[in-house]
Amino acid sequence: MNPVNNQPYHLPVGAIWLITGCSSGIGREIAQFVATKPNQRLIATARDPSSLSYLPDNDPNILKLPLDVTSTASVSNAFKAAAAHFGETYHIDVVVNNAGYSLSGDTESATDEEAHQEIETLFFGTARVTMQAVKVMRQEKDHRGGLIFNISSLAGVCAFPGHAYYHAGKFAIEGWTESVAREMHPDWNINFCIVEPSGVKTQFEHGSKKYMEPHEAYAADDMPARKLEAWVGKGLKSGAGIEPVAIAEALFNVASRDEKVPLHLPLGSTAYKLIKSKLEKRLEDLETFKELGAIG
């Protein structure tokens, strides 16, 4: 299997960061964090650029752009606008693919349109932006390379009831990113990091979540999805979760520490514990059912 992220990554002076989904939550926090760093430049994007008013308008190192990741034309236009703005110094050094939302509820109730739109945003949106960035990065003559953070989730590794299409999108990001990372020539110096945070203290549950119509067959309080909803609700009321600024700090640390980039980056103790538990159970099952699978 081809190795990935072979060489230490060195964040250049004057690096340009392109971040999607900057209107709120994690994306907003990362954009604000990068904007405070000297010798770093920022392309902050959102479907509605008026939501980026928290960033200054008169800083030549900060570019605010409209970007709908579900539109190929919108993605292409954003990259063209960035190239025009930064001119001869244009290069995409760091990408943070953060745009997305969660479709939650009883999977049996999901319409085709709801399911397709979720996957279109989470997965294909990430893929569109990533490949546009790869094109810019690999064409750099001095092999400056770059770093692409694809924001997955604990939900990209561990599945829970009531979020089937959200999991489908995040699991797809994980497998797709691993495959694309192995397609890169080592000389291109293009690095990938799949970010897997557990719960974050943002307005995600309210502003970045869409709910399917409830299904009467799953309405009872003892149904798994209802139990999970109650548990999550208690956690939100207690203030549980990762501070979004901690995610911004973690990503900047990965980019700037002059070391190899991890392909997977679980964030938070909950993510670490649950991912570790799943992998241990998977290894246990692998041995338990080895004879059942011994067919070749």
Q: Which positions does each model-derived feature cover?
A:
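Conserved glycine-rich Rossmann-like NAD(P)H-binding loop of the short-chain dehydrogenase/reductase
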Residues: 37-53
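Residue(s) in the substrate-gating loop at a strand-loop-helix junction
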Residues: 153
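Rossmann-fold cofactor-recognition segment
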Residues: 59-73
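Conserved glycine-rich cofactor-binding loop
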Residues: 23-24
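SDR active-site lid
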Residues: 185-261
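Active-site helix of classical SDR
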Residues: 130, 169
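Substrate-binding pocket helix/loop in short-chain dehydrogenase/reductase
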Residues: 106-107, 111-118
